[in-house]
Amino acid sequence: MNWHFLRTATVLLIFLVVVEINSEFRIQVRDYNTKNGTIKWHSIRRQKREWIKFAAACREGEDNSKRNPIAKIHSDCAANQQVTYRISGVGIDQPPYGIFIINQKTGEINITSIVDREITPFFIIYCRALNSLGQDLERPLELRVRVLDINDNPPVFSMSTFVGQIEENSNANTLVMRLNATGADEPNNLNSKIAFKIIRQEPSDSPMFIINRNTGEIRTMNNFLDREQYSQYSLAVRGSDRDGGADGMSAECECNIKILDVNDNIPYMEPSSHMVRIEENALSQNLVEIRVIDLDEEFSANWMAVIFFISGNEGGWFDIEMNERTNVGILKVIKPLDYEAVQNLQLSLGVRNKADFHHSIMSQYKVTATAISVTVLNVIEGSVFRPGSKTYVVRSDMGQNYKVGDFVATDLDTGLASTTVRYVMGNNPANLLNVDSKTGVITLRNKVTMEQYEMLNGKYQGTILSIDDALQRTCTGTINIDLQGSGWEKDSEKVTSSQNSGSSTGDSSGGTGGGGRENPSEGDTTTNTGGKTSTDYEDGETQTQSNNNHQELGSNNLSDNVHFGPAGIGLLIMGFLVLGLVPFLLMCCDCGGAPGAGAGFEPVPECSDGAIHSWAVEGPQPLPTDATTVCVPPIPSNNANVIECIDTSGVYTNEYGGREMQDLGGGERTTGFELTEGVKTSGVPEICQEYSGTLRRNSMRECREGGLNMNFMESYFCQKAYAYADEDEGRPSNDCLLIYDIEGVGSPAGSVGCCSFIGEDLDDSFLDTLGPKFKKLADISLGKEVEPDPSWPPESTEPICPQQGTEPIIGGHPPISPHFGTTTVISENTYPSGPGVQHPMPIPDPLGYGNVTVTESYTTSGTLKPTVHVHDNRHASNVVVTERVVGPISGTDLHGMLEMPDLRDGSNVIVTERVIAPSSSLPTSLTMPDPRESSNVVVTERVIRPASGMMGNLSIHPELSNAQNVIVTERVVSGSGISGISGLVGSAMGVSGGGMAMNSLGGGGGLSSSMGGTATIGHVRSSSDHHFSQTLGSASPSTARSRITKYSTVQYTK
């Protein structure tokens, strides 16, 4: 295929199309003028129909409205129809909005606001021409509006401080760093062209750097950088746009240039020469110190020096150790010098650095020698063994006193055998050898036996000492013996005798060599081992004794045979016998015997907290029971000096501990409690006799010895059943022994179930009378959200009781401040005696958070000679029952008043239950003053009073400071004399009752009562959403009508 022709044809075709599109058709028409007969030629031009394009550029940061209209569009379709012009794009219907607007009739486009080129460098406006139906008459037209740039942005450096480094002595024009700065103005424009300039240099001695104004490169100006002169330079550089013009904007930055160190300084030593002296055969660790000076950077490899020997140390006597922190060299003597061999030495030392020298001074470096003159001093030398060790061979056929060889010391001064020394054995394993003290001849002490051969493992290594008594010097030589051959003697008796003989001989020899001198003197001693090594010591006798000790230790160390002797076998047999004796010991052991037999386990003390049950029956712990309804036998009245403590109930519960004694008239009152719950039953009454005026109550320790009487228990529970059956069947819960709290928190087992006696087992009509105590259970069953109760941790304190004999305070607060906690002691059963009126005693309540069961029995009467422990009857026609209250009683009226002071704990509650007092002198009302905190709760329960002698209304003060306060009154039994009931005013709770007056609960925890009794502050919980507003009608004294359920705990929530 002819590609050249094809390319030519394609180019021609494209050219023809372009010409056709842009060409104009010119038609000439002859116009004949009939008048004058002339012809006119008219040129008619036909052009392609298109838009009229025009758009003027806008300058940023200026008001361009004076240039409006910046553009105008027009379509030739407007000649024969109505055209509507519309525009769209950025600045019109896209952010930023409203910059351009158009006249829809004329097509003029106007600008309305100031533009920023850095945000929008140009605008593209899409123009449309629409007819009356909204249809496009032309293709959309793109109109570009360019924004002209102005110099409104200064240069910006990428860093405020540039950091660079360069070695000293670098060549000129060496690149150090490159600065970077940019401008936000239009690129490739004069406004964004930045010129760099160094405006300051520190130190400013002479300029050392130059900068390229266009690229920002910083280079060295010369090769004179010297770190030892200046280690760092700081430059200030300015960058200006418009190529550094006067009308440009500028910015500045800092440049820190660090000069790196190179090894361009030759070290040298100070001083340049030394003279030292040293004795022969002496070693020195610090003969002379040589200091090296170097100007390079300290602690670098360019600064650390290395001192070397140039000459004079051919014998290797000296060595140099460098201290890298001080750059000081220490010359040491590591090999003894011999005066007879050399008297003077000339050492020549040189120095260099660890790092190589820089190329700039490599040619200048020359080794400079430092001379050290060493003078060797002559000393009187002792004898030495040359050579220091010898090896001999001993065979099995060599007998006692066999000459192994000789080992003679040499006098260093003369070079001949020493004649002034004596020889002794030093380390002599197995006492094998003996040495002649004068000649140094070594012989066998005894014939070598098999045991010695095995002990030495065929190799013997010992030492021989040469002692010069005149010079007080000692040298040491080493003796090596190779035991060869076989047939070593095995006679143990002979071996033992030989060893004993050799040992005594060695000891005597050692004593002769070391300490046999009569006049030992002090002096310098030289010890040479295998050469000319010398040491100093002062006492030659001590040295000899040390050698003897070494000999004995070496002999003991080699004796490492282990034998299993008779003692070890006996210990093993004894261990097995002991193991076999253990079963017999267990069979004979008395692991608990019959009671009273004298043998067995000791009882656990009652104060211990162990795993032993505190109840005296088998099975689980019995539930707490109430013994208040058990009939009490008549009390003898003719014996005033004997108190008969009759306890027919046998069932009691003690939950608190303590012991309290208090004077009652002329006698004593003793009350005992224990920190356990227990059940004691007895078929017969218990009688205890004490002195006059003294009451004694059996403790748990005494009751544990009793057994369980089922007949009595059956009688007791029958009485309880009949007592509850006589009561109103409309009670919400007929089981008073179960004290209910919030279900799931501290409730006893089975508290949800009802243990009451119900006539019909399948009758569930009792559910209609359930009280608010089951509200939480109902809420849980219905799926409602149950709010948790806040915790209330009380403080633990001790009770403070008033002194006996003080006058009762009426209307005031006595100085009694009981604190409440979980371990407070409670006096449960209190029995007044004596003729006088007893004063009130406050009893703080130790009840903690949770359910508790307390059974109490109190009684008061007229003037009683004996004080009797009596269980109170359930009902009495002439008593008011208050629980845990002790009140003074007189024969005619009640004058004793209880005044409870303000309690320090703001979350205390007040509980009044079961007050026992005669009706003849009961006051008309019970008054409780304002507690100090609105969270206090007052609960009054089971008030039984006669039909006469009391006011017939319950008045609750309306000034309750907090609507959350709760007052609950339960089981109020009143006679026909009650006139009316007034409820609670200003509170969310309704209360029904009679015969009691309470002031508002304002701020304290104190209680003031106008009747002769003591109110106990307890822990009571309820919730403010329970509204008790029942009205009790007339009832007989023996019945109780109430729809209010007893709550043992009432919780106040803010």
UniProtKB/Swiss-Prot annotation:
InterPro entries xrefs: Cadherin-domain_protein (IPR050971), Cadherin-like_dom (IPR002126), Cadherin-like_sf (IPR015919), Cadherin_CS (IPR020894), Cadherin_Y-type_LIR (IPR000233), Catenin-bd_sf (IPR027397), Desmosomal_cadherin (IPR009122)
Extracellular side stretches: 50-566
GO cellular component, one term: desmosome
Biased composition range(s): Low complexity: 496-507, 523-534
Composition skew (Polar residues), residue ranges: 542-554, 1029-1040
Annotated Desmoglein repeat repeat ranges: 830-856, 857-886, 887-916, 917-944, 945-973
The Cadherin domain, residue ranges: 50-157, 158-269, 270-389, 386-493
Keywords: Calcium, Cell adhesion, Cell junction, Cell membrane, Cleavage on pair of basic residues, Cytoplasm, Glycoprotein, Membrane, Metal-binding, Nucleus, Repeat, Signal, Transmembrane, Transmembrane helix
Signal peptide: 1-23
Glycosylation sites: N36, N110, N180, N557
Residues that span the membrane, as ranges: 567-587
Cytoplasmic side stretches: 588-1054
Protein name per its UniProtKB record: Desmoglein-1
Gene (UniProt): DSG1
